[in-house]
Amino acid sequence: MLSMSKAVKARAHTWYTIDMEKGVFRFNKRLCPRCGSVMAYHKEPVPRWHCGKCGYTIFESQAPRQRPSRGR
């Protein structure tokens, strides 16, 4: 349980970008295509988006590694 001495930081305002000229706001995070929940971004060990509710994972594409030639 949280003690009263610890302050809880509000993070919800970082999830949106507001464009005042157009009068629109945009959600910065990804939504899960399977269940619709908000997905978390993980940098380590492999960059990916992961849904904690259903387990769906989207791996970010990386530059393909070149295989060494076999000398044939």
Swiss-Prot record:
Keywords: Metal-binding, Ribonucleoprotein, Ribosomal protein, Zinc, Zinc-finger. It comes from the Archaea. Zn(2+) binds at C32, C35, C51, C54. One of its GO terms (molecular function) is zinc ion binding. The keyword Ribosomal protein applies. GO terms for cellular component: ribonucleoprotein complex; ribosome. One of its GO terms (biological process) is translation. Its cofactor is Zn(2+). A zinc finger (C4-type) spans 32-54. Binds 1 zinc ion per subunit. NCBIfam families: PRK00432.1 (NF001669). Belongs to the eukaryotic ribosomal protein eS31 family. Part of the 30S ribosomal subunit. This is Small ribosomal subunit protein eS31. It comes from Caldivirga maquilingensis (strain ATCC 700844 / DSM 13496 / JCM 10307 / IC-167).
